[in-house]
Amino acid sequence: MTALLAFLAAAEPATQGIDPWIAFFSLITVVITVGMGFWTAGKSKSAGDFFVAGRSVSVGWNASAISGEYLSAASFMGVAGMVMLNGYDALWYPVCYACGYLFLLLFIAGPLRRFGAYTIPDFAEGRYDSPLFRKIAVCFVLFIGFFYTMPQMKGAGTTLAYIFPGLHYSVGVIVVGAVITLNVALGGMKGITLVQAFQYWLKVFAITVPIFVIAAVVGHYQSHLEANKTAQETVAAAPAGIERKALPAKAPKDEQWIAPFGSLTTKAVDTAIKAAKTPEEKAALEANKKPYSLLYTYSLIIALVCGTAGLPHILVRFYTNPDGVAAKRTTMWVMILIGVFYVFPPIYGVIGRSLTPELYDAVGSKGTDKVVLELPTLLAGRDHPLLGSILSGITCAGAFAAFMSTFSGLLVSMSSALAHDIYGRMLKPDSSPEQRLKAFKWAAVIIGVVSVGLGTQVEKLNINYLVGQAFAIAAASYFPLLFMSVWWRGMTMRGAATGMLVGGLLALGSIFLTTLSDVYGFTTLADFWVAHPLLRILCEQPAIWAVPLSITLMIVVSKMTAATI
């Protein structure tokens, strides 16, 4: 390792500004992805190929493809950024992302595949013999899908702005959105299966290799963890007033009392408040305190675990397995594959706390979400400029793979809902397979344009924050529907529809209101949230009440309408 570093230290990157290695690796990733899309386009002929890849995907390929689709920009970039920003409190993200597949394995994957539908709305209509329920299910496919495309677009804009300094965030969103939309319109589900399987292994390579090399140069994980702990203890022991006066400008905006490392636990906020000597200091600290943080954490856990089992673009992939047994085996392997991946992003977050505190003072595409992209560049300041450029190129390639694979899956899921469930089943039931394929391609283009438009509006928000909201909507709508429909014979159509509509729409509405104030800063709405912090938390992350409400309504209404079974 020492000899290799000494050799690479002798070389300098060819240019300043746009790093050629970063541009090269990113371009190669895009070219391979689009090339695979064109190659498989010739093999995707039937409706079954476009919607469920002919139901012929093997366990290994499908597990890799599902993992590639699931490990989104939130996993590759967002987890590290949240750990850097919030410390231990953010570890629930990777843990719950992986645990959600246990619910899928135990309760949903096998029965869902044995049902033999093309889409989740297919399942909804088939289970309850209700075309109306299909329409409701399609609406929630779109609601969840559009909310989930926004963090992918945020990742795309952040990465492109990093690769091309000075490039506007929106330009990156538009360019990446156009490329992915073209890829999906060409190949459908069969086309993206190969792409997503390849992208999973690319992401694993891109998240693991750089962190091992970085640790060899800047110090191992434990040393940086100890540095974080020391800073935390120093701040907690010092009078808050003194600490605030000496505070660097690099501290996170929402926790100004802490050192450049950010907060490790919310308990430290209380410690600093108690140390405040004047009412003014105490009031300032109270204003920066995140209220009801434990309640938010519990709600987040419910959203991520249950939401994973309710994501339409993930669930539809189980229809590509040959049978229910293969679907269960696929789920087991997915848990292993994503579990291995999630070991590494928190390490980036911890090291980032020590080495890139300047990210705390930035917002949007320049904030902590880009710590994975930023850490390799530190090697340039340690006499390894070429090595830093190469590793930066690898991490950028992984970021491209992350948001491209997930956005592809979302586009297929939403386009299938429009082409198969709306056009093929409602608007024109006698349409030919060729007409449905054409409808799929047009739907992909329309949804791609809308997704890009939404993505340009969320630059200020954290990637994982957006993902948590999408998961909450899925947890309050699709998870209760699937779980109760599979395991309770007494469920009626009216019960399922009532629970899904009330729980899902209330979660959607509350999330929409908080996001609206975060993005556009409406004064009246912002003042209302300040005056009602508990209500703000319950609306920002509604899973803790929306999921039980949805299930309760399903049970009560089904009991009241048992005669309709």
Residue ranges of each PLM-predicted region?
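Membrane-embedded helix-loop-helix hairpins and adjacent transmembrane boundary segments
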Residues: 2-565
